[in-house]
């Protein structure tokens, strides 16, 4: 038996997650979009530019029912819209429809009947190209 390359525990396999996202924008296609994934401490876990992509969550802290895990309240959640920590410049009236699909690395669903893993997904910057948010009177 080769011990130089030990098998990793199941926790490592199940702790890494992928978030496939697609955001439909029903307005002009002249915009810049950056999607950020934040953890419970509002720290960026991963980010991507564009209306679709895949975010990686390494070492994801999954939600567990009370008394079923030593850290049961470690939740991620997602939101979009005009959040106080977003930097939004002047925008045309847009209708954003978020279609999020949480998948494990092998393509199995991690939502539904299983303990649901919610992720904090923020549309952190959405503005027309060439529009400076600071010049528009909004903090960057």
Swiss-Prot record:
InterPro entries: Beta-gal/glucu_dom_sf, Ig-like_fold
Expression tissues: Ubiquitous.
Gene3D superfamilies per record: Immunoglobulins
A GO BP entry: nervous system development
Similarity remark: Belongs to the glycosyl hydrolase 2 family.
Protein name, UniProt field: Putative inactive beta-glucuronidase-like protein SMA3
Source species: Homo sapiens (Human)
Source taxonomy: Eukaryota, Metazoa, Chordata, Craniata, Vertebrata
């Amino acid at each position: 038996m080769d011990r130089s390359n030990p098998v990793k525990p199941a926790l490592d396999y199940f702790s890494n997650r992928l978030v496939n996202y697609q955001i439909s924008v029903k307005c002009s296609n002249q915009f810049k979009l950056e999607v950020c994934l934040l953890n419970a401490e509002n720290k960026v876990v991963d980010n991507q530019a564009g209306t679709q992509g895949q975010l990686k969550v390494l070492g994801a802290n999954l939600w567990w029912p009370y008394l079923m895990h030593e850290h049961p309240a470690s939740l991620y959640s997602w939101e979009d819209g005009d959040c106080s920590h977003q930097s939004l410049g002047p925008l045309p009236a847009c209708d954003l429809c978020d279609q999020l699909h949480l998948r494990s690395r092998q393509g199995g669903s991690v939502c539904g009947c299983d303990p649901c893993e919610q992720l904090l997904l923020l549309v952190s910057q959405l503005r027309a190209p060439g529009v400076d948010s600071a010049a528009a009177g909004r903090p960057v």
